[in-house]
Amino acid sequence: MERPLTVLQVSLYHPTQGPVAFAKVPLQLQHDASRLLVGRGQDTHLQLQLPQLSRHHLCLEPYLEKGSNLLAFCLKVLTRQSCVWVNGLPLRYLEQVPLHSVNRISFSGIQMLIRKEGGASLEAFVCYFHLSPSPLIYRPKAQETDE
């Protein structure tokens, strides 16, 4: 009997380069339990068309947490050139952070929202990609006061 796959629902947004930056993004990508590379390189699993991205900018690494039978994921930064923000936390080269069920990620003008839906398979996972016409991450603006 086939086990249901862990699903990553990935929404993508770029304020000016959306259709161009995401031209090579598939609607669906099934991947084995190895790391999923993101960047502009031809050998990445999620290829984004932005010149300021590194060939290997970041990766999603699946792993099994102790005492769990579900895949968990961490995001690891592979670029030396810039910072990647994950849920408000800035990450630099080779830093990594575990992902939660909902994650807000920004890098090089790209906004990415990843929602994780657990599945029983430990051998593979599937990503569904959605292009958003509007921003995914909102930062409150500082309010001016008369004080």
From Swiss-Prot:
One Gene Ontology molecular-function label: deubiquitinase activator activity
SUPFAM superfamilies for the chain: SMAD/FHA domain (SSF49879)
Annotated Pfam families: FHA
Protein's GO biological process: auditory behavior; cochlea development; cochlea morphogenesis; craniofacial suture morphogenesis; genitalia development; genitalia morphogenesis; hard palate morphogenesis; hematopoietic progenitor cell differentiation
Residues in FHA domain copies: 36-108
InterPro entries linked: FHA_dom, SMAD_FHA_dom_sf, TIFA
Subunit description: Interacts with TIFA.
Job description of the protein: Inhibits TIFA-mediated TRAF6 activation possibly by inducing a conformational change in TIFA.
Name of the featured protein: TRAF-interacting protein with FHA domain-containing protein B
Gene (name only): Tifab
